[in-house]
Amino acid sequence: MNDLGLLKPVCLFEQFFDHKLRLNNAPCDEFAHFSCCTGVISTAVGSAIVSVGATCVICGIKVKVLPSSPLDPASLLICNIEHMSLAQRGQRINPAPSKELQSLAVHLERILVSVALPAIKSQLLIHSERGNGHNAFPSGSYLLHIDNTVVFDDGCLLDACLAAALAALKTASWPRLVAASLPIQNVGSALSTSKVEFKEKVPNELVKLVLSEWPMALSFAVVPRAPPNASLEAIFQPSRSECLLWDTDASACRLVVDSCGRVVDFTMFGGLASGLWRHLGVNDGSESTIGSLLRRIVVRAIEYASLVRQRLIADT
């Protein structure tokens, strides 16, 4: 094959993206289909399955008991994200956790602790049996494990994982425990060095978390158009196949907004994003194409967050 033959696929892709940016002929600002179902894992205290487009994520919550109360509230909540075998094309069976998923888990944990559950520590304390409610000195705490399993990965992972985690947290409930001191004659013979034991409160009472906020994530990509237009186009919730085709030409981003429409988190990854970096933080009073594009993205993110939030509240 000569050099001209090697260039043909590149030329075809350039011609393809000149008139079509999405593989499924969907409008650039169209949201992916969203669905949610709770109570899907009987052995978890709270669970949910969420689909965003073709991406499917299952979230389950486990509760453990700590005989002490950590000073850092973030240490009471641990997020984990893993791929199931063959969750995406080209993936090996039983792959090692990728850096992308580890980074995404840290990102998810930060959003939950700082936005959705800023007062998580006060809700996870275990008090003494003789204590006077929440005014008593805590004798232990609950530790929440939020495990997200990606059944199928077609992009928009933060959109799906955050929604699944919120739905699972909202429906989570478990018996409230109290700490009782062990008798003195039993302390020396106890299997552990702890001098307290935890038992269910009488009468029975359930612990249910109260979410302070419902932050929602929206993934999008900014794709440069070919000359003579040479403009930037925003693609909302692109699939993984579309992101792979754009490669480094697209600037993939994630935007998280709360119920008041405030942007609480913004992340860029993937492409160089040179078209955005030059204009973020510039406020000279003049109207620019990138400025209007960013405002349009934020408006659409608020619209999407409102729709998904209503679905989650109705389903939980």
At which residue positions do the language-model features occur?
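Polyanion-binding surfaces on beta-sheet-dominated domains and ring/shell assemblies
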Residues: 1-316
